[in-house]
Amino acid sequence: MLQPKRTKFRKQQKGRNRGQALRGSQIDFGEYGLKAIGRGRITARQIEAARRAMTRHIKRGGKIWIRIFPDKPITQKPLEVRQGKGKGGVEFWAANIQPGRVLYEMEGVPEGVARRAFELAAAKLPIKTVFVTRAIM
């Protein structure tokens, strides 16, 4: 599972997820990409589940790049605990995603295989995505 090795602070405030993706909106490494058109939060488990789905579909051919990293700690209080007594413990790590962000890239496989692999990956993710190629961008 992806998570930072160390952070300056253990917990973060919730924050707001507004605007378009300023960085990471171009295909930099591969030929094909999976681009977010919705906004939301993707957990480390979802990133890994999508990666596994793609890897299983393309078998041994091709290369995959993960362009997002879960660097935001999400805290949660235990069940049936009253409010107060401080912030809960870190439950999982997530990445804030804005529209326009490239989530995954792939090369070394035919376009049909890449398209199907990204469809399988998109089914594991909580936000709407679209298939993009380097030529279109």
From Swiss-Prot:
Q: What does this protein do?
A: Binds 23S rRNA and is also seen to make contacts with the A and possibly P site tRNAs.
UniProtKB keywords = Ribonucleoprotein, Ribosomal protein, RNA-binding, rRNA-binding, tRNA-binding
Q: Does the keyword rRNA processing apply?
A: no
Biological process terms in GO annotation: translation
State whether keyword rRNA-binding applies: yes
Descriptive protein name: Large ribosomal subunit protein uL16
* Cross-referenced InterPro entries: Ribosomal_uL16, Ribosomal_uL16_bact-type, Ribosomal_uL16_CS, Ribosomal_uL16_dom, Ribosomal_uL16_sf
Instruction: Note the superkingdom of the native organism.
Output: Bacteria
Gene3D superfamilies according to UniProt: Ribosomal protein L10e/L16 (3.90.1170.10)
Entry's family note:
Belongs to the universal ribosomal protein uL16 family.
Please tell me the species this chain comes from.
Answer: Nitrosococcus oceani (strain ATCC 19707 / BCRC 17464 / JCM 30415 / NCIMB 11848 / C-107)
